[in-house]
Amino acid sequence: MKDDEIKSMLGRCKTIAVVGISPKEDRPSYTVASYLKSKGYTIIPVRPDGETILGEKVYHSLQEIPPEVNIDIVDIFRRSEDVPPVVEEAIHRGAKVVWMQEGVIHPEAGASAERAGLQVVMDRCIKKEHQRLM
């Protein structure tokens, strides 16, 4: 994806579900989500356990997020082999973008998301891209 497309996406998207976020402050998923929240994005933590992270209610899956909440970006902090079911949930949930963080690469899942009409960013850090482009 080209820089101008990412910049436009980051400018118009406001709600980011962070799948695989850690409650540990030294983990990249936590620091990225904290940064995005500090920049005005609404963060929705998604992980199998926990109650709150960064002052936000933790949901155990994308499907658990109330349907009236529009998810713009699904930011994935999971191993590459764990990506396909997350992408399927993102598609069914009506997300606009699937963002796979640095080191998270799954071309087949990315292609599936694109076929469903989602934009896909793969193997890039959303925080670094925001700092660079915004």
Residue map of PLM features:
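NAD(P)-binding Rossmann-fold cofactor-contacting core
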Residues: 22-30, 34-54
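Rossmann-fold NAD(P)-binding glycine/threonine-rich loop
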Residues: 102-130
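Conserved beta-strand elements of the Class I
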Residues: 17-19
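Short, charged, surface-exposed secondary-structure boundary motifs
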Residues: 53-56, 69, 108-111, 129-134
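Short N-terminal or domain-adjacent regulatory/targeting segments
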Residues: 1-12
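A short helix->loop->beta-strand "cap" motif at the edges of active sites that frequently abuts
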Residues: 39-41, 93-98, 116-118
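Mid-chain, well-packed structural core segment of small domains
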Residues: 62-104
